[in-house]
Swiss-Prot record:
GATase (glutamine amidotransferase) and CPSase (carbamoyl phosphate synthase) form together the glutamine-dependent CPSase (CPSase P) (EC 6.3.5.5). In N.crassa, this enzyme is synthesized by 2 pathway-specific (arginine and pyrimidine) genes under separate control. One is linked to the arginine pathway and is designated CPSase A (arg-2 and arg-3), it is localized to mitochondria and repressed by arginine. A second one, CPSase P, is part of a multifunctional protein (pyr-3) encoding 3 enzymatic activities of the pyrimidine pathway (GATase, CPSase, and ATCase); it is localized to the cytoplasm and feedback inhibited and repressed by pyrimidines. It is found in: Cytoplasm; Nucleus. It comes from Neurospora crassa (strain ATCC 24698 / 74-OR23-1A / CBS 708.71 / DSM 1257 / FGSC 987). GO terms for biological process: 'de novo' pyrimidine nucleobase biosynthetic process; 'de novo' UMP biosynthetic process; glutamine metabolic process. Residues 401-442, 1485-1528 are annotated as: Linker. This is Multifunctional protein pyr-3. ATP 2 binds at residues 1138, 1177, 1179, 1184, 1209-1212, 1252, 1264. HAMAP family: Asp_carb_tr (MF_00001), CPSase_S_chain (MF_01209). Residues 228-413 form the Glutamine amidotransferase type-1 domain. Carbamoyl phosphate binds at residues 1581-1582, 1630, 1658, 1661, 1793-1794. Mn(2+) 3 binds at residues 1252, 1264. L-glutamine binds at residues 64, 273, 275, 303, 306, 344, 346-347.
């Protein structure tokens, strides 16, 4: 078998000269090609891999690597360059400061990618490549190092040789490598096995040399001389020397074979080194002699450890592939503690051969191999790992102290030479006795409540993990969490779930009721922590133990002062700050802090009065302003522009401590980490930076006493090693969810176990199943987290980013390069983003946007780069590390180059396409660059064999085999990690959490996956949101952490050969790609995407409702202000207005008058044919009702109805829902059920769907229908105890299930769902409810009635029941009247009422005592007792009911009403605010009834049982066919016979036909009928289409072949027709003579259908063309049709032009060659109808830009007077991707087919190409026509 050759796996560095290829050949013959970046030469050696993520300068200078080719598993190498070779070490005087020896020892270096000259670090003086060249060491990048590591892991260490490309043999496309027989292109050299040489002799010092410590710190011998360590240098790393010298001993370094028996010394140290200890006999003899004498303590490291063991008489063995990494756990046999160590060795001591008197000191916690030995009664010990680290963690450096202390003691007391070494940290037995396991049977877990900004889905994930862990330990778990939308609160997780507020009052009640043994407060975010702090002193009395981190620790971390003091006590520093109440105090404070400082006004919200001061003048100015707003200012050291770095730290009760993941913020300090782009692991920290912060993290966490998991954030000065601790979160946080997903290490699961006292080393790594959980993951990929903001949803919100978090969700992406990962992340944020490219959006000026970051920052960087800004200029403005900026600049430059090419240029350049994919560009983006379309690029890519590879996330960088199904796609690789035999069902997740689509869709996805798995299906989850349970790797059989877009889903679907794609559970994200997936040949499970489109296209949906007789509010799409005005007058105000292209209430507004309409339309959009608006009649005071249902094949099999508390007009996502409904009349309910059944049948739904109705006086109307799971599914499923998603999944998969199952809840009782808002985080946003959704989450509670449930649910959102003062401000008279009884009730209950002017007058008239308050002018406002703002500011108001008069359309931002001002103040001062009259009424009633609430078993009830329905008959079709109409038994000869109503009937029946065909129904409408087809001209399509149509309707066909018939004998047409009429019920005729239709009309006794009369007409083609336009674009009205080609003889065009006169607003453009123009009479029709827009002989970009329907016809040679005339125009109308770049993104390309050259094949892959679908629509249309003509 030929050995495998792999082409380079990554793109070459841009803008750098190519240094040639290198081929890495292995002993087994496989060859990996890559790019050279070191010395241009070939070498051979032993191939080894190292899994550390930092520290390449230290590693390559480590003498232990002598002769080895080093493979670094972390893919990004060279990022922080190389420090100066000249700088000498302060301690070692003549040795270099930054390296482990004075030369590079590796033979060669192999990496996946390389940073080139774009390195970034304040100490760097050159790139890695430059240094390697200086030292003559070859290096290569572009190798799939993961694949290579797996090969070494499986086969063991092997020999390799790096062969340089021959200079004279250039390769045309280096990125494709040299395929096939590569050897002639590369040099060749002999194999070398370094282990056969004495490598130690090469690296050891040549003669003894003495190093002395600083006299001030020197340790002395009793005789007065310095304490001396003799070091045997068998390949010593300089840091071992540094560790000794800085501890005050002098070191005599001796060569490896030196006989040191004559030397005077106090301790013997044997260093690390390379090679096999077997060849070192001389050294072993010298050590043996020292052991015999036992004059001094002895300590060995690495090779020194192996030599000591051999000298003692033990044996050593060669390991399969060695241990080389920075994360290897070693357990001490003395203390039982587990330490994370740095290692680099290929041999080990065989512990079974240790002689008497010796025992194991450390063992490897992963594989049990020996890691250290000690003598029982002599001071001799050694370790296999590197306690001096560099690179790696410094956790075991204390062993140097142990050794030196032992040496010092032995010099004063030589009896100690007869004793073993003493180690700190107690014994294993003592430690286990001090920290026993916690014995608990029942644990209470506090959840986090509703999702809000700053506290979102990550707690669903971490809470679910914690419960899984507790269940695994057999503990009964009780959860309090009112968040009904999450998996955490589902059946099957916790044993009991309380849907109650997570606050002290209710938690106390639950504890008394449940009597748990223990409680967890660390899995519910800030909410749960606060409760823990409030109840801290009561827990003991309640008999509850706090698990995990102690509450006192939490209090320390939450309180700035306490925290700063605590840090000071261990010598760590926080940001310096001081408070001042005058300018003088501030100036004094600064002396200690130093400039620059940040000044903030204390007690001011939203960062009021804060700013930066760089000098005294600025400080004075700022303080004056701030002190005007507040009595005190805080002055704090400004670290703006510093790097922000985070570590996730885990610690168990026995003090084992690890850091699981470190993260670097792309944005510098100053932006909240939740609003920052975050990269894991850090990219620009050197080993010293990384481990300095890691060591600090471990020290801080140990000092604080955290048990479980926590997060520590630092600010790091990029120009020094100065750092500050910003904060510690002693709980699971957003970062922990991210870290878990980024590394595959299940933090929350582990933390829950640690809280039970289980030590880390006893918990298994669930991914590898063989290693333990006490280790630090090594990553061989890079992860980018990016926030998603939804600031457009709010009025008047500030878009600036700062220290307060504003994002509502986040995405995470994984790649093998930063470019690949960040481009994926940008696309994941929003469907419209294609990647890192300039955006045409309305940004502020680029400089402003870069300096004051907003949610548009990344696009501003792209625009700046596009405009030619340099990396340095952008860095000055943003302070984003230059390494990141250089990477982005590379993308920007590549994109610029690509736009110069077209698809045709790229066809022969697979290397370009490959490079683009390796840089993370998506097909859509490339299609944009190259004027093509996504599917054409895809096809080109597949033909070039360019597809992504699937890689695993395994926590160990491939060092151990992993059983992980956690996967991502990358183009930077050369092989897959997995095989594809499952053929699973793909479930598409919800994508990023945003307003309108949040955790409820994750619940749906997970429930679907669990149902599929329980039913025996293999499952594949696709999602990219790190906060979710669905991206937990144990939920599905395979998890692809990938984007949900057409390209990625197709890639996964085709690789996995999946059985189908289930998209109905993930909300709108999967729905958006359902139709394109279907068209690309994917089996989409559930309702047909064409039906989804029918429900989502307002024209199609509206027509469908009319067809089935379901009412809807009147609406119209309008293209001018006058039309809009006229429509509004007709339907009367108020109306809803919105731009036509948006869904889900984006930019919608309610308009109450013509003046409002005018200003809204000016502000929102210029109304024009390009930008139409949709206006809908707004029905005031109507109830809104939510229907959630499941259907199978169009029959409803389960449903629940919930009612909204608020009237229609509040977005359903912001509404309060009640289930079962309390105020609906039976008739309303029945009408809703009836309408639902009709809609389900018409859309042929299989699976979940949701309909929103409005009802007024029992009249119901449909607002919208979502053919997918909706936001309310978890709520109704949990309240009713019937899992609708499980039912829907079974219906979709054809599994058995029970229709309308029994409802599982006790009788009586109501569930109420209440929205959770986050206005307090969004400074400036107006907290009113409207048609735009604004809530970020939801909660629900249960009660005896709706009032109790509502109050509990409202309290769950943080609402506090008012104690005494209530302020009222009610706008409209109607609301005042409606509120009166409620206000009276408040007064009776003893509340003190305050009100604004109008409200106060009204209440006083009705004898309700009230105090008047007013918003006064600035100067009076401060002191007046009537000041409303002062009452709010001083927290004198407990509840503010502010009911604005009609929520007018959004006013421009500068208009600030008093109402807005006070509403905003209420939010800022955290005063409960109610802005809706219905909410106010139910709230008052609830407060009146339920002053204090008891908890207990809640009784549930349903007020009605759904009726069991018998099979439903579809009457509409029968009705349509039996009604009198103009098709019945009539000829169909010309389009001129038909009206718009006739067309409407034909198309309605065609839609029914389509449903029928899709359901696979056998129809017998025309059973027993016969159709004859008579074609005098050749035809395959039309005849086949009629034949298929007839047969599908149950009829038969006789086709007459005219060329063999009696026609040849001279029979006339009329005779043929009369004869056929004797056999058939109808005839389809095509004839070259235009007058044939007159003959037919005159002589045929049965209906004749014209299939083309010469070049005159082709009516059925025109019908199907119109039907196609309706189906593709929703409507025909208002469209612009462009007809191209032969318009003179193109009969379908003539018919179509005639029919278009029936549709208003249609415009026509004609493009044809001279001589083939539209016939004059047809053209006249267009002119008369006012539809002719333009005529041209060429298809110009302007014409295309206006086109909605591009209709192409054949230009045939025979139509031209001469060959020359034909040749002139032949190619001028060819439609290809190049032409289409000028076309609209939503349009249709049509062609009656067959085609010649008119449309290029590449266009077939464009979503807009409708011509093959046109054929299918034709079938439905002709079925409808035949049925109408022939039935009955």
């Amino acid at each position: 078998m030929a050995a495998t050759v792999y082409r380079p796996a990554t793109a070459p560095i841009a803008d750098a000269p190519c240094e040639g290829l290198v081929c890495l050949e292995l002993e087994d013959g496989s060859a990996y090609q890559g790019y050279s970046f070191g010395a241009p030469k070939s070498i051979a050696g032993e191939l080894v891999f190292q899994t550390g993520m930092v520290g390449y300068p230290e590693s390559v200078t480590d003498p232990s690597y002598r002769g080895q080719i080093l493979v670094i598993t972390f893919p990004l190498v060279g990022n922080y360059g190389v420090p100066s070779r000249e700088t000498v070490d302060d301690l070692l005087k003549d040795l270099p400061a930054h390296f482990e020896s004075n030369q590079i020892h590796i033979a060669g270096l192999v990496t996946a990618s390389y940073a080139g000259e774009d390195f970034s670090h304040f100490l760097a003086t050159s790139s890695l490549g430059t240094w390697l060249k200086e030292q003559g060491i070859p290096a290569m990048y572009g190798v799939d190092t993961r694949a290579l590591t797996k090969r070494i892991r499986e086969k063991g260490s092997m020999l390799g040789r790096m062969l340089l490309q021959k200079e004279d043999l250039a390769v045309s496309a280096p990125s494709l490598g040299v395929p096939g027989d590569w050897k002639p292109h590369f040099e060749t050299i002999e194999w070398v096995n370094p282990n056969e040489k004495n490598l130690v002799a090469e690296v050891s010092i040549k003669e003894p040399k003495l190093y002395k410590p600083d006299e001030a710190t020197a340790l002395k011998h009793p005789s007065g001389r310095n304490l001396r360590i003799l070091c045997l240098d068998v390949g010593m790393k300089y840091n071992q020397l540094r560790c000794f010298i800085k501890r005050g001993v002098e070191v005599l370094v001796c060569p490896w074979d030196y006989d040191f028996s004559k030397e005077e010394y106090d301790g013997l140290f044997i260093s690390n080194g390379p090679g096999d200890p077997k060849v070192m006999d001389t050294t072993v003899e010298h050590i043996s002699a020292a052991l015999q004498k036992n004059n001094t303590p002895i300590f060995g490291i690495c090779l020194g450890h192996q030599l000591l063991a051999r000298a003692a008489g033990a044996k050593t063995v060669k390991l399969k592939f060695g241990n080389r990494g920075h994360n290897i756990p070693c357990t001490s046999m003395v203390t039982g503690k587990c330490h994370i160590t740095s290692q680099n060795h290929g041999y080990a001591v065989d512990a079974t051969t240790l002689p008497t008197g010796w025992q194991e000191l450390f063992i490897n916690a992963n594989d049990g191999s020996n890691e250290g030995i000690m003598h029982v009664d002599r001071p001799h010990f050694s370790v296999q790992f590197h306690p001096e680290s560099t690179p790696g963690p410094r956790d075991t450096e204390f062993l140097f102290d142990v050794f030196i202390q032992t040496v010092a003691k032995c010099t004063t007391d030589n009896t100690l030479l007869q004793k073993g070494v003493e180690f700190p940290g107690g014994t294993t037995e003592e430690n286990e006795r001090l920290h026993p396991r916690v014995d608990v049977k029942k644990v209470l877990v506090l959840g986090s409540g509703g999702l809000s900004i700053g506290q979102a889905g990550e707690f669903d994930y971490s809470g679910s993990q914690a419960i899984k862990a507790l269940k695994e330990e057999g503990i009964y778990t009780v959860l309090i969490n009112p968040n009904i939308a999450t998996i955490q609160t589902s059946k099957g997780l916790a044993d009991k779930v309380y849907f109650l507020p997570v606050n002290a009052e209710f938690v106390r009640k639950v504890i008394k009721y449940e009597q748990p043994d223990a409680i967890y407060c660390t899995f519910g975010g800030q909410t749960a922590l606060s409760v823990g702090i409030q109840l801290k002193d009561e827990f003991e009395a309640l008999g509850v133990k706090v698990l995990g981190t102690p509450i006192d620790t939490i209090i320390t971390t939450e309180d700035r002062e306490l925290f700063a003091r605590s840090m000071e006590s261990i010598g760590e520093k926080c940001a310096k700050s001081a408070s001042a109440s005058s300018v003088e105090e501030a100036l004094n404070a600064v002396k200690d802090i130093g400039y620059p400082v940040i000044v903030r006004a204390a007690y001011a919200l939203g960062g009021l009065g804060s700013g930066f001061a760089n000098n005294e003048a600025e400080l004075v100015d700022l303080c004056n302003k701030a002190l005007a707003a507040s009595p005190q200012v805080l002055v704090e050291r400004s670290m703006k522009g510093w790097k922000e770095i985070e570590y996730e730290v885990v610690r168990d009760a026995q003090d084992n401590c690890i850091t699981v993941c470190n993260m670097e913020n792309f944005d510098p300090l100053g932006i909240h980490t939740g609003d920052s782009i975050v990269v894991a692991p850090s990219q620009t920290l050197s080993d010293e930076d990384y481990n300095m912060l890691r060591t600090t993290a471990v020290n801080v966490i140990r000092h604080l006493g955290v048990v479980g998991e926590c997060n520590i954030q630092y600010a790091l000065n990029p120009f020094s090693r100065e750092y500050c601790i910003i904060e510690v979160n002693a709980r699971l946080s957003r970062s922990s969810a991210l870290a878990s997903k980024a590394t595959g290490y299940p933090l929350a699961f582990i933390a829950a176990k640690l809280g039970l006292g289980i030590p880390l080393k006893e918990i298994k790594n669930t991914v590898t199943k063989v290693t333990c959980a006490c280790f630090e993951p090594s990553l061989d990929y890079v992860v980018v987290k990016m926030p998603r903001w939804d600031l457009k949803k709010f009025t008047r919100v500030s878009t600036q980013l700062g220290s307060s978090m504003k994002s509502v969700g986040e995405v995470m992406s994984i790649g093998r390069t930063f470019e690949e990962a960040i481009q994926k992340a940008i696309r994941a944020i929003d469907f419209h983003n294609l990647g890192f490219s300039e955006s045409k959006g309305a940004l502020m000026s680029v400089d402003d946007e870069l300096q004051t970051p907003s949610d548009q920052r990344l696009f501003a960087i792209a625009n700046a780069m596009h405009a030619g800004y340099t990396v340095d200029r952008i860095w000055e403005l943003t302070k984003i590390d230059k390494w990141f900026l250089s990477k982005l600049k590379g993308l920007s430059n590549f994109a610029k180059d690509m736009t110069k090419l077209t698809a045709n240029d790229v066809v022969g350049r697979p290397d370009l396409l490959l490079r683009a994919k390796q840089l993370g560009f998506c097909d859509r983006q490339l299609a944009n660059f190259w004027d093509s379309n996504e599917l054409a690029i895809r096809r080109m890519r597949l033909e070039a064999g360019i597809t992504p590879f699937v890689k695993q996330i395994d926590t160990v960088a491939a060092e151990f085999p992993a059983f992980t199904n956690y996967l991502y796609l990358t183009y930077n690789a050369s092989e897959h990690d997995v095989s594809f035999e499952d053929r699973g069902v793909m479930v598409l997740g919800s994508g990023v959490y945003r307003i309108g689509s949040s955790v409820e869709f994750d619940w749906c996805s997970v429930r679907a996956i669990r149902t599929l798995r329980e039913s025996g299906f293999k499952t594949i989850m696709v999602n990219y949101n790190p906060e979710t349970v669905s991206t937990d790797y144990d939920e599905a059989d395979k998890l692809y952490f990938e984007n949900i877009n057409l390209e990625t889903v197709l890639d996964v679907y085709q690789m996995e050969d999946a059985t189908g794609v289930l998209g109905a559970m993930g909300g709108q994200t999967p729905n958006n790609i359902a139709l394109p997936l279907l068209r690309a040949g994917v089996r989409v499970l559930g309702t047909s995407p064409e039906m989804i489109d029918t429900a989502e296209n307002r024209y199609k949906f509206s027509r469908m409702l009319d067809r089935i007789g379901v009412d809807q509010p009147t609406w119209k799409e309008l293209t001018s202000f006058d039309e809009a005005k006229a429509f509004c007058q007709k339907v009367s105000y108020p109306v809803l207005v919105r731009p036509s292209y948006v869904l889900s209430g984006a930019a919608m507004n309610t308009v109450y008058s013509e003046a409002d309409l005018e200003s809204y339309l000016q502000q929102a959009a210029d109304v024009s044919p390009e930008h139409p608006v949709v206006i809908t009649k707004y029905i005031e005071n109507a109830k809104e009702i939510e229907m959630d249902a499941v259907a199978k094949d169009g029959k409803v099999v389960g449903h629940f109805i919930s009612e909204h508390v608020e009237n229609a007009g509040v977005h359903s996502g912001d509404a309060t829902l009640i289930l079962p409904p309390q105020d609906l009349e039976q008739t309303t309910i029945q009408r809703i059920e009836e309408a639902t059944r009709k809609i389900g049948a018409a859309l042929n739904v299989t699976g979940p769907f949701n309909i929103q109705f409005i009802a007024k006086d029992n009249d119901i109307k449909v607002i919208e229908c979502n053919v997918r799971a909706s936001r309310s599914f978890p709520f109704v499923s949990k309240v009713m105890g019937v899992d609708l998603i499980e039912m829907a999944t079974k219906a979709i998969m054809g599994l058995p299930f029970v229709e309308y199952p029994a409802i599982d809840r006790p009788s009586g009782g109501v569930g109420v769902k209440v929205p959770q808002f986050s206005f307090s985080r969004l400074s400036g946003a107006d907290p009113v409810l409207g048609v735009e959704m604004a809530s970020t989450g939801e909660v629900a509670s249960f009660g005896v009635d709706k009032y109790e449930a509502y109050l509990k649910a409202l309290m769950s959102t943080g609402f506090k029941v008012p104690k005494k003062n209530i302020l009222l401000s009610i706008g409209s008279y109607k609301d005042k009247k409606e509120m009166l009884p409620s206000v009276a009730k408040l007064s009776q209950m003893g509340y003190k009422l305050f009100a604004t002017a109008g409200t106060a007058d009204f209440l006083q008239e009705h004898d309700i005592p009230v105090q008047f308050l007013e918003v006064l002018a600035k100067e009076d406002d401060q002191k007046s007792e009537y000041s409303l703002t002062q009452h709010l500011a001083n927290n004198m108001i407990d509840l503010y009911i502010n009911l604005p008069s009609n929520n007018r359309y959004r006013r421009p931002a500068n208009y600030i009403s008093k109402g807005y001002q006070t509403r905003r103040m209420a939010v800022d001062y955290q005063i409960p605010l109610v802005t809706n009259v219905k909410n106010a009424k139910i709230l008052v009633e609830a407060i009146a009834r339920y002053r204090d609430m008891e908890i207990g078993e809640r009784d549930y009830q349903t007020s009605h049982t759904p009726l069991q329905l018998s099979g439903q008959v579809n009457f509409t079709l029968q009705d349509s066919l039996s009604r009198p109409h103009s098709f019945k038994k009539a000829h169909v000869l010309s389009v001129e016979q038909y009206t718009r109503a006739d067309l409407h009937l034909l198309f309605t029946v065609a839609e029914e036909m389509r449903l029928s065909v899709q359901r696979g129904n056998v129809m017998d409408i025309l059973k027993g009928r016969m159709l004859a087809t008579l074609f005098y001209e050749p035809s395959t399509r039309t005849s086949a289409s009629f034949e298929a149509a007839m047969k599908r309707l149950g009829g038969e066909v006789i086709s007459i072949a005219t060329q063999h018939s009696s026609v040849q004998k001279g029979e006339t047409l009329q005779d043929t027709l009369r004869t056929l009429a004797c056999y058939a019920d109808a005839i389809v005729l095509r004839h070259p003579d235009e007058t044939c239709v007159d003959v037919a009309k005159k002589y045929s006794p049965v209906p004749v259908v014209n299939a083309g009369n010469g070049s005159r007409e082709h009516p059925t083609q025109a019908f199907l063309d119109l039907f196609t336009v309706r189906e593709e674009l929703g409507t025909v009205q208002g469209l612009t049709f462009t007809f191209v080609g032969d318009l003179r003889y193109g009969r379908p065009v003539h018919s179509l032009v005639y029919l278009l006169r029936h549709y208003s607003g249609v415009k026509v453009q004609l493009v044809s060659p001279k001589g083939l123009e539209l016939p004059t009479d047809v053209r006249q029709q267009l002119v008369k109808a006012g539809q002719l827009l333009c005529e041209s002989e060429t298809l110009t970009p302007e014409i295309l830009g206006k086109t909605d329907v591009l209709y192409c016809t054949r230009v045939q040679k025979e139509r031209f007077p001469s060959e020359a005339e034909y040749e002139k125009v032949k190619g001028s109308y060819r439609i290809d991707n190049q032409t289409l770049k000028h076309a609209k993104s939503k349009m249709a390309i049509m062609h009656p087919l067959p085609r010649n050259e008119e449309i290029a094949e590449e266009v077939d892959f464009d979503q807009r190409a409708a011509y093959f679908r046109q054929m299918r629509y034709g079938l439905y249309c002709r079925m409808a026509l035949l049925a109408l003509v022939m039935s009955g």
